[in-house]
Amino acid sequence: SGFATAVSGHSNRKVREALLKQAEKLTHAPDSPTLPRALLAKKLAEIMPRGLKRSVFGLNGGDAIEIALKLARSYTKKSEIIAFQGGFHGRATYGCMSVTSVNFSKKGCFPQVPGMHHVPYAYCYRCAFGKEYPECNLWCTDYIVNMLEGGMTGLAEPAALIVEPLLG
């Protein structure tokens, strides 16, 4: 499915063997309680910082985004979310579409979820501001700091920052 090749190791031998071993036991369990899920939740509870003992599992990246948005807003009691321009977080749900800045996934689906703010990704190779490092003095980070500290941006205390690690 989708980008499953990236998460399954691009045909790495050890990953293939682990997948085959697991396929002999259980191949699919949508939201069903299973022993592997319980063991993973237990392990996560053991290694998480004090006070963070609960786990929420989703079936895909869209679930991960929706769960993250819900938890961030619920925990912080704040509604604003920052995402980066060029990020793609899915198009199946309104939360995913709203933090995605790619236009083709939003076409005809307005209004979006309120409180989403897109800022330029700090990427020196293709600077959104047309500047060059190091002469720019990391102007892109100053821009984001101004978004957070500036009195006129409406973004003083965001609930979360959503980052796509493979932005491209």
Give short role names for the model-derived ranges.
Residues 42-159:
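PLP-dependent aspartate aminotransferase-fold enzymes
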Residues 125, 162-168:
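Conserved PLP phosphate-binding loop immediately N-terminal to the Schiff-base lysine helix
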Residues 7, 29, 132-136:
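Pocket-edge positions in alpha/beta enzyme catalytic cores
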Residues 3-20, 30-43:
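A structural motif shared across PLP-dependent enzymes of the aminotransferase-like
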